[in-house]
Amino acid sequence: MIREDEPAIIFMDEDARRLHHSHDDAIVITLAIANYTTRRVLIDNESSADILFYPTFHKMRINKELLHLTNVPLIGFGGTKVLLVGTISFLVMVGSYPRQINKEVNFLVVNYSSSYNAIIRWPTLNSLRATTSTYHLSVKLPTKYGIEEVQGDQLAARECYLAMLVVNEQMQTMNIEERRTLAKQIKVLEDVSLVESNPGKFTKIGSSMREKTK
């Protein structure tokens, strides 16, 4: 419940003066996750799951056996199927002393190549009573010591975006090469009769096979 004496969260023009305009950048911030300073954390108001990418988890040097295995599929991340390694709960610290909030967050750990280290979803933002502004690249949330602002890193957001474009382009190129290889294989198939007296019975084999093998 919001107290009547709690200050309102507002965004002003001066909050955006530090940014380069105009922009369509995402909100990318730094959080303390499991006591590790974690940069390149994407704030996603549309994501339904808190994501921690496995390379980041690995760098934390946390025992993999602490992960809880789950059968929940994650089949639509960035339009690509991803491998769900497991789930784990970490304490996340938002803000800086004294206006900081500690929150236990349950992460899905996924094995996927990403320029981000983690993604924070909208239910977690709601539990923090956080308000975001994509124009100001800012997250503000109430604390008992006043309103805390976590500013987005515009440069990091642009670097992550460009890096993801490269990854997506590489994946598309791989898919195109796979289709070309498959098409080439189909073209070199030829009909071979199984029974000489019955031309209707035949199979398809590669035309590059040796005559004796045929």
Regions found by a protein language model. Give the residues of each.
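Short linear "hotspot" motifs
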Residues: M1-K214
